[in-house]
């Protein structure tokens, strides 16, 4: 079994404590077993849809889907894939807001297993530590690579950064298109959903909150 990084263990524990972890079973199968079993079940699903898997266009589809699920779009279910995080002592005593805008994310709606496509804005006010900026993007991507609801995704990113940075002063906003709305059901091709999660000064200070929300509006504009 792959050992987890200290950061992965801390983040997972923080989410569990707050009831924000993705619902997971206790049993963990190894990667190749998961791929094999998903392939078997996907073969059965496609056959039930009356698709001919002897056709060369379809023959490898169950294998491709199994590989995609385990290695790519649901890789964030495995904390062994949690990004390597570099947290640096805040020697410069930075105490102003650090904001990363237009973080592209692609996730999967856990209700219908179709795409959620959007962008995130993440901000924090450093305390004792700062984080490599690309690590913020990687944390967003990690939690996006799961079956998700947008509200939980937003809060998971917030708690992960609060845990790693040792400060509550974190804010996250996500603006996304849900293909369970766009491609099925009501089939509304133009609507988008915005979720925001605020901590520390972003919640208690009106000025700090407004500064963050201006950055969000700039992104949406």
Curated annotation (Swiss-Prot):
A Pfam family: GTP_cyclohydroI
Positions bound to Zn(2+): 109, 112, 180
GO annotation (BP), single: tetrahydrofolate biosynthetic process
SUPFAM superfamilies: Tetrahydrobiopterin biosynthesis enzymes-like
EC number from the UniProt entry: 3.5.4.16
Membrane-spanning segments: none
The protein's enzyme class: hydrolase
Reactions it catalyzes: GTP + H2O = 7,8-dihydroneopterin 3'-triphosphate + formate + H(+)
Keywords: GTP-binding, Hydrolase, Metal-binding, Nucleotide-binding, One-carbon metabolism, Zinc
Residues spanning the signal sequence: none
Gene Ontology MF, one: GTP binding
Gene3D superfamilies the UniProt entry points to: 1.10.286.10, 3.30.1130.10
GO CC, alphabetical: cytoplasm
Domain of life: Bacteria
Pathway linked to the protein: Cofactor biosynthesis; 7,8-dihydroneopterin triphosphate biosynthesis; 7,8-dihydroneopterin triphosphate from GTP: step 1/1
Database matches in NCBIfam families: folE, PRK09347.1-1, PRK09347.1-3
PANTHER family given in the database record: GTP CYCLOHYDROLASE 1, GTP CYCLOHYDROLASE I
Subunit structure: Toroid-shaped homodecamer, composed of two pentamers of five dimers.
HAMAP family per record: FolE
Family (UniProt): Belongs to the GTP cyclohydrolase I family.
Protein name in UniProt: GTP cyclohydrolase 1
Organism expressing this protein natively: Serratia proteamaculans (strain 568)
Protein encoded by which gene: folE
